[in-house]
UniProtKB/Swiss-Prot annotation:
Phosphoserine carried by residues: S138, S141, S436, S536, S720, S725
Subcellular location: Membrane
UniProt source species: Saccharomyces cerevisiae (strain ATCC 204508 / S288c) (Baker's yeast)
Region (Disordered): 675-726, 763-837
Cellular component terms per the entry's GO annotation: cytoplasm; cytosol; plasma membrane
Pfam family, one: Arrestin_N
TM region(s), chain numbering: none
Protein name per its UniProtKB record: Protein ROD1
Additional information: Present with 386 molecules/cell in log phase SD medium.
Gene3D superfamilies recorded: 2.60.40.640
GO biological-process terms attached to the record: cellular response to glucose stimulus; positive regulation of receptor internalization; response to xenobiotic stimulus; ubiquitin-dependent endocytosis
Low complexity composition bias: residue spans: 685-703, 763-773, 805-815
Subunit structure: Interacts with RSP5 via its 2 PY-motifs.
Glycyl lysine isopeptide (Lys-Gly) (interchain with G-Cter in ubiquitin) crosslink residues: K401
């Protein structure tokens, strides 16, 4: 019994809110606010206590808040100062009713009390002895600390144990999304559970919830190409384009620049590309505050080597001495530049495009600055911009702030002063967060490992567009990243190759065991790059742009085999290694080389038949260097921390359930025997003729006759009633007379056997005439004295049949049917006459 004392009660060991079916507490909404469907939010409130505690109520609510840190520049005596004012607004709230929790409390002690806690009151009646119906109808709680019922106190006592309180709610699809990456602005959601206790402080548990809105699979932005076409009069015509308007945070986009020079002697200089975020926010009063920040940037110092050519001319002073143009370079009618721009995978460095009510608006655009080197020496700049849309994709892992960092950052919002400078860009420096204090969301997606192993280009690095391998790698990576965001194009299913067509006709058939291993190895080898940027000095692994790989060329397979075999490619998913001792002339080696070369074809933006496969749009190739760094044995064997283990999960395919072998063995041994019901009306009597002298057949006939009263159950077949030829019956019957044992199954009769000779009229009813019965009684007494029994183990039914047959033979010794005993025609004629009579 919980006793009231001056000492404070112990705090619960565990008081937490756990959400179900959510990755890192992320509530994903697909589609725009006016089209998105509702989502289910469910979970449990977990409570673990070591001693009884008293609670009044348990409340749960979900609320969302918008917070702004609005700067205002003030002119003072000491100069301009920037003052920050806090703006806060509740944008969503949902309260769970306590009725379900109270009903849960009423049933707690039926499950957990076990009679350990008693109550003493004026009456000697214990609550445990009360009828169950009375306890259910009572609105009072359970136990009071002072020995009285808690009807007047209105609180509950929870005994030692673990408790789970489930909850669920339907969240509308128009819910405002979370914004955590903007400086001086934030939209956050939280679940708050409160346990109200008498005479003690309340217990409060908060759970940070992220509401992320992503694009629907049919969004136009995922397949819409954005481009700008314009001309600089008497200088250049240019076209700048990107494949899709929507770009996922943490992915990359390919930038295509096409310039047609008009002025003679014009050269291409450095190209600078930057991704700029423009955000606007305002409070209930004042104007709109604009702020910009650089999200990503890329600089191509000399994409076409024009700057190097000019420096070479100046070093030789050819233009200054001779005064003529001695340019021996090839004339180019157009300049093509391709660059891969990486978007940082962090919501602290950029935010998604959004519009939160009338308070926050975020947009992005890519700015281009192209330098043009004129013949007279001065530099002209071509500037352009493309609007893009950044969104959060569930297929790409993204770094986010932890809940502690978010709370710490929001506390800094409010009145503060800061001295402004000329280079101030309206950013509050106190809002920047260390990169080490970040968490990862969507890391359980199957593409997380693939994107982490993608070879990327660091911002600010130079892309050598003249290198064929660098260009092919950039194009391939962009195509692969884009395919993760865009749904598959089902119109291209005509290019699918049947798996059986991969093998060659000339190769010999391998064993079944080796073919399974080879198929797995082929799939793994296709996912590896031979070229390695870190091992470019190695002649084996160095990329060779002169080698052309084709599916139909067997010579290329042979020439490529040495470099592939000597590279000792370690397969990721299998323990197969291609060694140097592998014979290239063997059929297996040729098959491997063919598949390796087919998988290493440089993919392009348009599909070709050289590298078609049945891989879906989410599959992509990975580099061997990244896989080597990401899948080290030491990293895989390292035991993760508890928090990381709770937030991470193994990446793999769902497998069917594995059933115990014992149960399978028992089920296999139990064979279901299906019995065919016995035919009620037999068209032929040959199948019912028993073999003479068979005691087993008579026993079976008795067994079958005893089952005829079960009219609704299927009757088993009589195995002894097999077809017997008339010749065998003739051989067994020496007196040219036949004894037939016909079994007729009828609903009117419980007897299934009738005994009669061929030359007498049968009675198909169960009641025979008294005259026939007396006749058989007389003949039985005479025939038993004249004919001895052949076997001692004959049953009484067999004895009666033989005695009846002998009496009939004695009475019909002069019958004309005896003359044609073995004739089938005479037999049928006898049956016809018998039926007519």
């Amino acid at each position: 019994m919980f006793s009231s004392s001056s000492r404070p009660s112990k705090e619960p060991l565990l008081f937490d809110i756990r959400l179900r079916n959510l990755d890192n507490d992320v509530l994903l909404i697909k589609g725009p606010p006016d089209e998105a469907s509702s989502v289910l939010l469910s979970g449990t409130i977990v409570l673990s206590i070591t001693e009884p505690i008293q609670i009044k109520s348990l409340a749960l609510r979900l609320f969302g808040r918008l917070r702004l840190n609005i700067p205002t520049v003030l002119q003072t005596v000491h100069g301009p100062h920037k003052r920050y004012s806090k703006f806060e607004r509740n944008i969503y709230s949902h309260f769970w009713d306590d009725f379900n929790i109270k009903s849960y409390f009423q049933n707690l002690y039926d499950n957990h009390n076990n009679g350990k806690i008693t109550i003493s009151s004026k009456s000697s009646t214990n609550l445990a002895a009360l009828p169950k119906r009375k306890r259910a109808l009572s609105t009072a709680s359970l136990i009071s600390s002072n020995g009285q019922t808690s009807a007047s106190k209105n609180y509950h006592t929870l005994v030692k144990g673990n408790y789970e309180f489930p909850f669920s709610a339907i969240i509308p699809g128009s819910l405002v999304e979370s914004v955590e990456g903007l400086p001086n602005a934030a939209v956050t959601y939280a679940l708050e559970a409160t346990i109200e206790r008498p005479k003690q402080p309340d217990l409060i548990c908060k759970k940070h919830l992220r509401v992320i809105r992503t694009l629907a699979i049919d969004a136009v932005e995922l397949s819409e190409t954005v481009s700008v076409d314009n001309s600089w009069p008497e200088k250049v015509d240019y076209t700048i384009s990107i494949p899709t308007k929507a770009i996922a945070i943490g992915s990359s986009t390919m930038i295509n620049i096409l310039i047609v020079p008009i002025l003679k002697g014009l050269k291409l200089g450095p190209v600078r590309i930057s991704l700029v975020e423009n955000s606007q926010y305002c409070g209930s009063y004042g104007g709109v505050i604009n702020q910009e920040r650089m999200v990503a940037k890329l600089k191509l110092k000399d994409p076409l080597k024009h700057v190097a050519q000019i420096k070479k001319k100046r070093s030789l002073n050819e233009a200054a001495d001779e005064g003529v143009d001695t340019d021996t370079g090839e004339f180019q009618d157009k300049w093509e530049v391709r660059a891969l721009l990486n978007i940082p995978a962090s919501l602290t460095k950029c935010s998604q495009d959004c519009r939160i009510l009338s308070n926050i608006k975020v947009r992005h655009k890519i700015k281009f600055t192209i330098s043009l080197l004129n013949p007279d020496g001065h530099i002209s700049e071509l500037r352009a911009a493309l609007p893009v849309q950044l969104f959060i994709s569930p297929f790409v892992p993204v770094n986010v702030k932890t809940s502690d960092v978010i709370e710490r950052t929001l506390k800094t919002f409010g009145p503060s002063y800061q001295v402004t400078s000329q280079h101030d860009n309206s950013f509050s420096s106190k809002n920047f967060v260390d990169d080490s204090e970040e968490d990862v969301i969507f890391q359980r997606s199957a593409s997380a490992l693939q994107l982490s192993s993608m070879p990327t280009i660091v911002s600010g690095s130079t892309l050598n567009i003249n290198s064929t391998d660098a260009e092919a790698t950039a194009v391939a990576d962009t195509t692969m990243v884009t395919s993760l965001m865009v749904p598959p194009n089902y119109g291209n299913h005509v290019y699918d190759r049947v798996y059986g067509e991969v093998t060659n006709e000339d190769e010999t058939s391998a064993s079944a065991s080796s073919s399974a291993v080879e198929s797995q190895a082929i799939h793994n080898i296709q996912n590896l790059y031979i070229s390695d940027s870190n091992n470019s000095n190695n002649p084996i692994l160095a990329p060779n742009p002169q080698i052309k790989i084709e599916d139909d060329s067997l010579n290329n397979c042979d020439s490529r085999g040495d470099s592939v075999n000597n590279s000792n490619l370690n397969l990721v998913n299998s323990n197969l290694t291609i060694s140097e001792n592998w014979n290239n002339n063997s059929p297996s080696a040729n098959r491997y080389n063919n598949i390796i070369n087919a998988g290493l074809n440089s993919p392009s933006l348009t599909p070709s038949f050289a590298h078609l496969s049945r891989r879906n749009s989410y599959s992509r190739q990975t580099s061997s260097t990244s896989l080597k760094n990401d899948l080290e044995l030491t990293d895989l064997s390292r035991v993760p921390s508890y928090d990381k283990a709770m937030k991470s999960d193994m990446i793999g395919e769902d497998l069917p359930p594995a059933y115990p072998e014992e149960e399978l063995g028992v089920q296999e041994n139990k064979k279901i025997e299906l019995e065919r019901p016995q035919i009620l009306h037999h068209k032929s009597t040959s199948s019912l003729l028993p073999l003479p002298g068979s005691s087993k057949s008579s026993n079976n006939l008795k067994r079958s006759s005893s089952r005829t009263h079960l009219s609704h159950s299927p009757l088993p077949r009589n195995n002894s009633g097999s077809s017997v030829s008339l010749q065998q019956l003739a051989r067994n019957n020496t007196d040219s007379s036949f004894n037939l044992n016909l079994s007729f199954t009828s609903a009117k009769s419980s007897t299934g056997s009738r005994h009669f000779p061929f030359n007498m009229t049968t009675s198909f009813t169960s009641n025979s005439s008294s005259k026939n019965n007396s006749h058989f009684d007389k003949t039985d007494s005479t025939s038993d004295a004249n004919k001895p029994r052949e076997e001692e183990n004959y049953t009484s039914a067999t004895h009666n049949r033989r005695s009846r047959s002998s009496s009939v033979r004695s009475n019909n010794s002069n019958s004309p049917l005896r003359q044609g005993t073995g004739s089938f025609a005479n037999l049928m004629e006898m049956f016809t006459k018998r039926d007519r009579s």
